[in-house]
Amino acid sequence: MIKNGTCPYWERDDLSECARREYIEFKFPLFILLTGMIYAFCKVFRAFYLRGKNHTNEAPEFEEQGNGNHEYARFSVLRLKSAWESRSFCNVNNRSTFDKFKKFIEGAFIVLQLTIHLYILSSMLMDNKKFFHQGFLVQMFLWILLLVVITLRLISASQSFRWVLACKRDLWAVSFYSYASLFTLSILPLRSVFIGKIKDKIMVKYIISETFIDLALLLLLSTSSIEGTRYSFLVENENKKLPPAPTVFGLLTFSRIDRLIWKAYKHCLGNADIWDLDINNKSIAILANFEMSSKKGRLLPNIICYFKAVFISQLFLAFVSSFLNFVPSLLMPRILSYVNDPKSKSWNLVSLYVSSMLVSKIIATTCRGQGLFLGEKGTMQLRTVLISNIYSKTLRRTILKDSTTSLQKNASTSFEENPDSSEAEPRKKSSRKDNSVNNVMSIDAFKVSEAMNTFYLACEAVFMTVTALMILYSLLGWSAFAGTFALLAMIPLNFWCATFYGNYQADQLILTDKRTSGISEALNSIRVIKLLAWENLFYQKIINVRDGEIRLLKKKATIFFLNHLIWFFGPTLVSAITFSVFIKFQNQTLTPTIAFTALSLFAILRTPMDQIASTVSLLIQSFISLERIQDYLNESETRKYEILEQSNTKFGFEDASMEWEAAETSFKLKNISIDFKLNSLNAIIGPTGSGKSSLLLGLLGELNLLSGKIYVPTVESRDDLEIGKDGMTNSMAYCSQTPWLISGTIKDNVVFGEIFNKQKFDDVMKSCCLDKDIKAMTAGIRTDVGDGGFSLSGGQQQRIALARAIYSSSRYLILDDCLSAVDPETALYIYEECLCGPMMKGRTCIITSHNISLVTKRADWLVLLDRGEVKSQGKPSDLIKSNEFLRESINNDSKNTTHNQIDLKRSTTSKKTKNGDPEGGNSQDEVCAEVENFEETKMEGSVKFSAYKWLADYFGGLGVVFVFTSSSILIHGITLSQGFWLRYWLDTGSSGSKSTWLYRIVEGHSNIYFLLTYIIIGLVSSFLTSGKVWIAIISGTNVTKKIFAKLLSSILYAKLRFHNVTPTGRIMNRFSKDMDIIDQQLIPNFEGLSYSVVVCLWIILLIGYVTPQFLLFAIPLCALYYTVCTLYLRASRELKRIDNINISPIHQLFAEAIKGVTTIRALADERRFITQSLVAIDRSNAPFFYLNMATEWITYRVDIIGTLVLFSSSVMIIMKASYLDAGLAGILLSNAFSFTETAQWIIKVFSSVELLMSSVERIKEYTDIPSESNGYISPPANWPQTGDVELKNLSLRYSPHSSKALDNVSFKVKAGTKVGIVGRTGAGKSSIIAAIYRLSDWENGTITIDNKDIKHIPLERLRNSISCIPQDPTLFDGTVRSNLDPFDRYSDVQIYGVLSKVGLIEECDELCLIFEQEQPNFSSHKLRNRFIDLNTVVKSGGSNLSQGQRQLLCLARSMLGARNIMLIDEATASIDYISDAKIQKTIRETMKNTTILTIAHRLRSVIDYDKILVMEMGRVKEYDHPYTLISDRNTIFYRLCRQSGEFENLFELAKVSFDNKR
């Protein structure tokens, strides 16, 4: 009994009467009254005072911060008002009619309470009960306050009291707070009534009525939607569904998601079924709040500052949950004491103990669920912050080479920078780094965000550890500190393991970056890799990196084993030391009550210790990933917003010097002074490598400005510009040398965020010569271009990119050699109708080109560049007169309408949607054409058994799994024996135990014997458990190695169509996130699942053995388990699959932003792309958010069911107290304590396995994709010996729904013949090469080489037997040698020889070249080239070379391995005409006996060939000698030559060639 003065709080087994009167009926209600009244008054007064200023019907407004500069204006999320306004709308989530009716019921109950209190108060006054009426008076005033509050809540709908809406939520909170407090206070008096302690009939009725009315009011408010928030959700479209309005009950028990779970149970979910996010969880709101709370500096302090409220809440909830979790352990000694002596305590008191265990566990479960959900919501929000910041940084990051970060510290630096790089070149310059960016976004951001969950677990672990030690001290005295010291002694070992683990993790991430970089490079260049038959080369290269990664994973597994062993053995060691000190040094008797209470505490202590181990590991990984993100965010940013100066009258350079990097070898533009003519066509010309593209990038502010000034029309964001009367803005549009397209339709790529105007759109399509292409496409302008434009030809891509610039509202156009990929006829048409036509009225255009005769024809201003300097500039007519180079170029090349550059990007090499029969298309946009949609498919239903079997087969079959599970049963049996050993140890002195077989074994032994045996059992159990985990992880690592190899092989050898229709981001998702899941999460979860199932089965069997009556409870409890698990698993499975699918678009957005960052910045369109990223993040966050809610839904219910198991076990024990000994009861309760956690762990791990298995499904899906059909007849070693090629009736289409790319094509090429293939863009020229290389399956027909059907030749043998110079000049990360001769088949002399032949180095004696390489001091005046030696670094994609130089290197690669057949696909389009002529001469002289098929737009390149093949609409229209065709006025070839503008030269060259061959 505890006393306070003369009033005891507790009398034997119940609350004392004076305590009830003083505290329950007076002081506590007075506190509720005062706090509620003060809070309500303050809120109502504030709302009334601000009644004219508050607008509750508006979306949230965020005050802008920042320095007001242009960079801030472009990238600050606070400026994205369009995301709140025009691009979305607020949807009102109104309260239901029933909810409104509930308020009237609530008011009626309050009036009833007032009536009851008035009646009882009047009765007390009549009886003159002074003390009583004080409490009742306070409670009556409290109900009057609540009546006022409900009245204000009811009248808020009136127009006269609209101001009340501002405080409606606060008034609702006062009501809920009061009802909950009053109901809580009524519980103990109600118990007193039930156990008969209160005899007064009026008081009994009052207490019962008070309790149930309070309960009714509490349930009314708990199940009604929370008032005060009308505009709860922000949605992107009207079809987006809103979740149910939040209720207290729904929030606390996570019942808000019930409808979604039931829906998932009934049928499969789709994206349309996923509810929208709360406005506070929208990415724009998260980022706006984060930006306002952040300061410049490191990311970690800003994260802590932003999430401080979440951390404080988690801290409080962890404290409450941790303390309440120990209530059962505190009550356990009293229950065991009752079992030991049932007469020592009353039944009422013991039942109170058991009920308190139930209530405390329910409250602890609720607090824990809320704390974890706060962490999971924080995880989503932090992930949003990190991904958005990384994406924004990607748009701000400089394209220059000096932006290298620690992500690639060991990457070798490149040599002289690219002077003619284009849009894609800056991207590819750092492609290795860019692929690392993908890891930063997809892996590091996720790992860091998971730390939000870790924080709660860490707090809980600390609180639980401290609480457990305090209770142990109260139970065992100072001996508990001995165990504490042992615990502390293990911490340095843990940190030692953590340090090694962190180092291995950092090393692994570096290798992961390298691996994904290699995979990304392979995917981006897959067509060229297949042409070169280099699949195995890249396979081995990537596998070698993967092997290093696997070795580190195994090292991490070993460290994890040691760490796991330390912490798993910890409780045994601590308990053994504590017990030994307790017995030996304190001379105390260790009773079952003390021992098993301590053991329950040690068992509980195992959880926080395990959490500490895993938390340390996770935090180390998170900090490493955070540092990687910080390194990326610290990278150099573009300085364009600082160096560009705005001018309305000047557009150009003033004595400007620019460079790519601060290095002596870096290419520089020197003393550039150009004033481009406004409203005119300005042309920039110069030889290959002169710096034309660099000049344009300098004008865009992308290069380092060393001196001088750059003047542009504007540096403001596109959204901030005013539209003029002519419909244009003072902005710039950029069309890069390499066409950059986004995944979407043709219309999406052309309109590109502008307002759609059909007339303008049609005019642009026509002027860019796209109208006929659109008509030939089944879906018209709704045709999906594929990833980066894969479904289009290179010329189509280039024209679409040009159309985007023309369609834009920009008054200033910057076009980088945008006509190089189209035929002469198309080029001339575009130049005349587009660049010099009505679409350019009032616009300033700057264009670069090698086609001097074409661009000078109608240009108003001409700039001649050479070696980074302006040699001359002025009107074309003036320069032609004074400049011999121009006169010679024009005389030699006349008006050739072909240009200098072919498409670089890997996507442009694909020629998938070719022009078929125009009559078969439809030009009407309004027609709902069938669009071939390549959306990612989602598996439905449960994870198929085939997926589990597929994974098990890699482990060795289901037998191995059975053996593994059986070992878990044996190991946990050993663990349980520890408790039974302790029981027999404690019972050895009792008479009841002397008849047992165990007693006869242990009789006569000392406590040391028992203690050592206890330790040995624990050590064996810990070692076996940890060893099993280690074996599982090591085995899993070996399995993932095989799976990765299978996946990589499947992707590399897949048909090219798979790569054409599958976005790279989607494939990379398999290799990054999905593979990471299998590497590090799946197997540990499988192991944890098997162990937890075994533990639960043991516990149920044990409880059922000791108390068979428990089985009556077990049946309905198991039914409950099954029900909630079934509901959850179906929902979580569907949500996880949608989550996996919705992440891919974020990968795609990143990939597109990296590729097109220069174009995006040039268009000043950063805000729109940031907004798109936020929409994609929200779509990804929605299933992720509700998946986490569903996880807490099941966790809460499993915890409650587990609490019922503990409760029912306790009831069974006290009911059988006279039949049980305390030791057995202690074992029973100790295991019952751990049952809840174990059962929860089963559900969580099983659901995790189900969810993680979706990654296995996704990887399995990509391991089953069709591979290229391989031949089975190996030809002779010298095949092809002569080089005869024949195509017979060949038809080819790239997809079942597309037009034929080749339609019944037949022609024959004799050995040694050189054939030029010509035709307009999309005619099917490149499809001939695709057919010969078997890149696509033919519909019908045959191709024979030396009379052998190539369909039966093994693919690698076929492709290695043919030389090819592809349209895409693709180079790979490495050196000059590795790009030319990756298999080391040729000598340095041979390599230098071909470099000299293609003009990359000047003529020089081969011995001189080698000598100069070996003697750095030796200098040859003849050797002036960019290639210092064959080990010179080549960046991925050849980004540190100009476009022309890349083409020359590819030409050299093909000539080095020249075969009897060579296929050339526009290989010289991006070099100047003089170099082209030299190369053509080299080809003719060095390959006289080689069969050559050349696709060319430059007719001069093939005019002296043996044959010309004219293609049109996929058909062979003409095939004869050039002179024969050009002599016939009715031929297509004659028309092409006429349109080229150099007919006389072509005719003369053809005649000379014809005469020479006669």
Swiss-Prot record:
ABC transmembrane type-1 domain sequence ranges: 311-621, 961-1251
Where does the protein principally reside?
A: membrane
UniProt gene name: NFT1
Listed A to Z, the keywords are: ATP-binding, Glycoprotein, Membrane, Nucleotide-binding, Repeat, Transmembrane, Transmembrane helix, Transport
Q: Where is the composition biased (Polar residues)?
A: 892-901
Q: Which residues lie on this side of the membrane: Extracellular?
A: 1-29, 125-130, 191-201, 324-351, 471-481, 580-584, 975-1013, 1106-1109, 1221-1222
Any transmembrane segments, and where?
A: 30-50, 104-124, 131-151, 170-190, 202-222, 303-323, 352-374, 450-470, 482-504, 559-579, 585-605, 954-974, 1014-1034, 1083-1105, 1110-1132, 1200-1220, 1223-1243
Any idea which positions bind ATP? Answer: 686-693, 1319-1326
- Record's protein name: ABC transporter NFT1
Outline which residue ranges sit on the Cytoplasmic face. Answer: 51-103, 152-169, 223-302, 375-449, 505-558, 606-953, 1035-1082, 1133-1199, 1244-1558
Taxonomic source organism: Saccharomyces cerevisiae (strain Lalvin EC1118 / Prise de mousse) (Baker's yeast)
